[in-house]
C-alpha cells in the first residue's frame, strides 16, 4: 500500500512539475532579427522601424519594449518582417490585431498590383509567442520559423 501511495504521489509530482514549465522567452526583437539574419539570406532588407512603426502601424516607442520593421529596399516587393515585444499581454493582443490588419492590407494591395507575390503572402506567418508578436512575409518563412522554434 505504501508503495502504491508513494508511486501515485511521485506521478502527481512529476505531472505538476512538467505543467509548471514555461516556454523559453524569445530574445528581444533586434536580437531575434540578428539570429534570423545569420540563418537566412536577408540581402536588400532595410530597417524602417523609426519611420514606419508609427506611420504604418500607429505604434510609438512608448507602446513596446522593442521592435524591428524590415522591408525590401530594392524593387517592388511585399517582403516585410515586423517583430514587436509588448509590455504586457494586453499590448501583445493589440499588436496581433494591428499586424493582422497589416497582413490584410498587404494582401489587398498585392491583388491589385503585385499578383506575382500572392503565393508568398498566402504563406506569411503571423505569430504570437508570449509577448513577442511577429509578421513574416518572406519567401523564407519556413526557415525563419525554425529560428523561432529553436528557442522553444
Task: Outline where the language-model segments fall.
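A short acidic-to-branched-hydrophobic micro-motif
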Residues: 78-88
Amino acid at each position: 500500500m505504501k508503495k502504491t501511495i508513494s508511486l501515485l504521489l511521485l506521478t502527481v509530482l512529476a505531472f505538476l512539475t512538467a505543467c509548471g514549465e514555461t516556454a523559453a522567452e524569445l530574445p528581444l526583437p533586434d536580437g531575434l532579427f540578428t539570429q534570423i539574419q545569420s540563418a537566412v539570406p536577408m540581402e536588400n532588407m532595410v530597417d524602417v522601424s523609426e519611420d514606419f512603426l508609427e506611420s504604418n502601424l500607429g505604434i510609438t516607442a512608448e507602446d513596446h519594449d522593442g521592435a524591428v520593421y524590415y522591408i525590401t529596399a530594392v524593387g517592388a516587393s511585399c517582403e516585410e518582417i515586423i517583430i514587436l515585444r509588448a509590455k504586457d499581454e494586453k499590448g501583445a493582443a493589440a499588436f496581433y490585431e494591428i499586424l493582422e490588419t497589416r497582413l490584410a492590407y498587404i494582401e489587398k494591395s498585392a491583388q491589385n498590383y503585385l499578383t506575382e507575390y500572392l503565393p508568398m503572402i498566402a504563406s506569411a506567418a503571423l505569430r504570437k509567442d508570449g509577448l513577442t508578436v511577429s509578421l513574416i512575409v518572406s519567401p523564407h518563412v519556413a526557415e525563419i520559423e525554425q529560428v523561432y522554434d529553436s528557442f522553444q
